[in-house]
């Protein structure tokens, strides 16, 4: 029996096959917005996340336009949108809706295994593509990263452990994302940010912390580790006061 990540990747292979049968990428280029510029100061990448394998339904019927508008008004430096339908109940339509509402950098959060998914994300309005080291053979990761650059987009290369960190460093990517969630077990440990952040600081690489960030104390912890930003989904999707969360992110250390 495979891990959750194995199941997701198998589903992505089916989706990619369907895309090749039903979708023709557009050729036009368009203006993009830079996450790297946003990360020159501590940044919240605020996520539109309807559901997840670990939590089930989180905010299934969220009004994407309203949520994204609130994020931008509260000071988000970028917005992340889950486009996976099977496990996270998102869609490329959600991404497109977010693009129509917002002019800040937009991340396509999905399990990317093929160039055609990047084409689809580009057409829907993404500026940033998530590439997950754990989900890709090394050569495929390099190929997809090169394609992201070719499209004029930026990438967050996501890691969870030391082995994945070494693979990511070879790419010298725009941004590295330390995922505190183990995608094989979906368990969360904020200690991964502190452990892996030390090496990324030594390499002088731009990096963010992802998953498991719910409180002011968590923000202080990842800031002290050297993160230039945080990607936050569940805490914002269930918050009764999104503005308060953003105020907490302004804490000095």
From Swiss-Prot:
Q: Which Gene3D superfamilies match?
A: Aldolase class I
List, alphabetically, the InterPro entries matched. Aldolase_TIM, Indole-3-glycerol_P_synth, Indole-3-glycerol_P_synth_dom, Indole-3-GlycerolPSynthase_CS, RibuloseP-bd_barrel
GO molecular function terms attached to this record: indole-3-glycerol-phosphate synthase activity; phosphoribosylanthranilate isomerase activity
Keyword Lyase present in the record's keywords: the answer is yes
Keyword annotations for this protein, in alphabetical order, are: Amino-acid biosynthesis, Aromatic amino acid biosynthesis, Decarboxylase, Lyase, Tryptophan biosynthesis
Which reactions appear under catalytic activity for this entry? 1-(2-carboxyphenylamino)-1-deoxy-D-ribulose 5-phosphate + H(+) = (1S,2R)-1-C-(indol-3-yl)glycerol 3-phosphate + CO2 + H2O
Q: What is this protein called?
A: Indole-3-glycerol phosphate synthase
Q: Tell me its EC number(s), please.
A: 4.1.1.48
Give the protein family. Belongs to the TrpC family.
* BP GO terms, sorted: L-tryptophan biosynthetic process
Q: In which pathway does it act?
A: Amino-acid biosynthesis; L-tryptophan biosynthesis; L-tryptophan from chorismate: step 4/5
Q: Which domain of life is it from?
A: Bacteria
Cysteine-cysteine disulfides: none
Q: Which Pfam families match?
A: IGPS
């Amino acid at each position: 029996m495979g891990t959750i990540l194995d199941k997701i990747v198998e589903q992505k292979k089916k989706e990619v096959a369907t895309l090749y049968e039903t979708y023709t990428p557009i050729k036009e280029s368009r203006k993009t917005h830079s996450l790297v510029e946003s990360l020159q100061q501590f940044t919240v990448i605020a996520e539109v996340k309807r559901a997840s394998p670990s939590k089930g339904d989180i905010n299934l019927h969220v009004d994407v336009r309203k949520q994204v508008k609130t994020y931008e008004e509260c000071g988000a430096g970028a917005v992340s949108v889950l486009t996976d339908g099977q496990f996270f109940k998102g869609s490329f339509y959600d991404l497109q809706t977010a693009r129509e509402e917002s002019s800040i950098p937009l991340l396509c959060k999905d399990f990317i295994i093929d160039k055609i998914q990047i084409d689809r994300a580009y057409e829907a309005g993404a500026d940033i593509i998530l590439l997950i080291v754990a989900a890709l053979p090394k050569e495929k990761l390099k190929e997809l990263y090169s394609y992201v650059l070719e499209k004029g987009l930026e990438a967050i290369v996501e890691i969870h452990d030391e082995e994945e960190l070494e693979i990511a460093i070879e790419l010298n990517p725009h941004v590295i994302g330390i995922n505190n969630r183990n995608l094989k077990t979906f368990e969360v440990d904020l200690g991964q940010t502190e452990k892996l952040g030390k090496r990324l600081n030594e390499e002088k690489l731009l990096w963010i912390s992802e998953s498991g960030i719910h409180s002011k104390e968590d923000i202080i912890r990842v800031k002290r580790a050297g993160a230039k930003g945080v990607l936050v989904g569940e805490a914002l999707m269930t918050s009764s006061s999104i503005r308060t969360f953003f105020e907490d992110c302004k804490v000095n250390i």
